[in-house]
UniProtKB/Swiss-Prot annotation:
Modified residues (N6-methyllysine): 200
Source species taxonomy: Eukaryota, Metazoa, Chordata, Craniata, Vertebrata
Residues recorded as bearing N6-acetyllysine in the entry: 200, 210, 238, 248
Name listed for the protein in its UniProt record: Electron transfer flavoprotein subunit beta
Post-translational modification: Methylated. Trimethylation at Lys-200 and Lys-203 may negatively regulate the activity in electron transfer from acyl-CoA dehydrogenases.
N6,N6,N6-trimethyllysine modified-residue sites: 200, 203
Binding site for AMP: 9, 39-42, 66, 123-134
Segments crossing the lipid bilayer: none
Pfam families found in the cross-reference section: ETF
Similarity remark: Belongs to the ETF beta-subunit/FixA family.
Keyword RNA-binding: no
Superkingdom in the source lineage: Eukaryota
Any one Gene Ontology molecular-function term assigned to this protein's record: nucleotide binding
Notes concerning its domains: The recognition loop recognizes a hydrophobic patch at the surface of interacting dehydrogenases and acts as a static anchor at the interface.
């Protein structure tokens, strides 16, 4: 097969080092004035696409993000890492809070068809909702084979070999292209964007479109009832002997 075109999905999330705070009304988490960055699993997906391009196996990498205007910063990061151009599916901030895997998967599937890509790469999950559904749903809408939790990816002609870690060992899949692959942490270690590449990324093209331009309805079928902090754990009690342990368990009604 000739050189491929790859679509890589990137999500803007609260930075992994930030301590999450729940809103007083428990409708979500505080995002205003909080540092955001690219989802770490998405970084791995971008890195893998760039490595395939460096091997002359991929000719173009398109970075895609859905959400408010700030998502363009996330796309710029992908461009600085080596993506060729970006597509921002603009969604107002109020609506973006209700975007779920189903809506994003519909967008990605439509873009994959529109751009005539051969490979869709994305992180296996996002660290904010941990849904682990978008890649699978995208493959379902496209009716393409999928390789999830990829720990190694190898292009073999018109097929892609995906190794994935499972309980008790490794599973190897060979998927006929076009295909969808989701990245595990073990797939690679993303590079840091260099200053020259960051400057070049500012000149690369980002196309801004609406979900409606793709014929996608972003209305969510789910609603968040409440978001709460995990309950605080009570302090443990140290015991010196087995007899003390049994006595303590009896005292608290465990035995």
């Amino acid at each position: 097969m000739a050189e491929l075109r790859a679509l890589v999905a990137v999500k803007r999330v609260i930075d992994f080092a930030v301590k999450i705070r729940v809103k007083p009304d428990k409708t979500g988490v505080v995002t205003d004035g909080v540092k955001h960055s690219m989802n770490p699993f998405c970084e791995i997906a971008v890195e893998e696409a760039v490595r395939l391009k460096e091997k002359k196996l991929v000719k173009e990498i398109i970075a895609v993000s859905c959400g408010p205007a700030q998502c363009q910063e996330t796309i710029r990061t992908a461009l600085a890492m080596g993506a060729d151009r970006g597509i921002h599916v603009e969604v107002p901030a109020a609506e973006a809070n209700h975007l779920g895997p189903l809506q994003v998967a519909r967008v990605l599937a439509k873009l994959a068809e529109k751009e005539k890509v051969d490979l869709v790469l994305l992180g296996k999950q996002a660290i904010d909702d941990d849904c682990n559904q978008t890649g699978q749903m995208t493959a379902g809408f496209l009716d393409w084979p999928q390789g999830t939790f990829a720990s190694q990816v190898t292009l073999e002609g018109d097929k892609i070999k995906v190794e994935r870690e499972i309980d008790g060992g490794l599973e190897t899949l060979r998927l006929k292209l076009p295909a969808v692959v989701t990245a595990d942490l073990r797939l690679n270690e993303p590079r840091y964007a260099t200053l020259p590449n960051i400057m070049k990324a500012k000149k690369k093209k980002i196309e801004v479109i609406k979900a409606g331009d793709l014929g996608v309805d972003l209305t969510s079928k789910l609603s968040v009832i409440s978001v709460e902090d995990p309950p605080q754990r009570t302090a443990g009690v140290k015991v010196e002997t087995t007899e003390d342990l049994v006595a303590k368990l009896k005292e608290i009604g465990r035995i």
